Swiss-Prot record:
Any one biological process term the GO annotation gives: translation
Gene Ontology CC, one term: small ribosomal subunit
The keyword RNA-binding belongs to this UniProt entry's keyword annotation: yes
Entries under InterPro entries matching the protein: NA-bd_OB-fold (IPR012340), Ribosomal_uS12 (IPR006032), Ribosomal_uS12_bac (IPR005679)
Region (Disordered) location: 1-30, 105-124
Keyword RNA-binding: yes
Name assigned to this protein: Small ribosomal subunit protein uS12
Gene: rpsL
Amino acid sequence: MPTIQQLVRKGRRDKVAKVKTAALKGSPQRRGVCTRVYTTTPKKPNSALRKVARVKLTSQVEVTAYIPGEGHNLQEHSMVLVRGGRVKDLPGVRYKIIRGSLDTQGVKNRKQARSRYGAKKEKS
């Protein structure tokens, strides 16, 4: 514990909060190229084949990003837009791919929460 004299001389140093989406370099989204598209299994107690992609961003960082929604058209060399947001049951996946922008198509036959999945309004 410092003395009062030491605090007068140096003061306290503020703690710097760790950034959760460091690869975006402060941007809300970043463009990137898929280097690998594959499925992985979640941690216990969940069970599924979650669709993920390794993406090389314009910030020269390679990240693992989740592909939300049912079905996708992504393959190697697809251009994608990546945002922050982790997937709780996939360790190391801290980014999500934005559906309906660049090479990523929106989810087909989506009725609710359409804007999150890049789905157009159905013509009635």
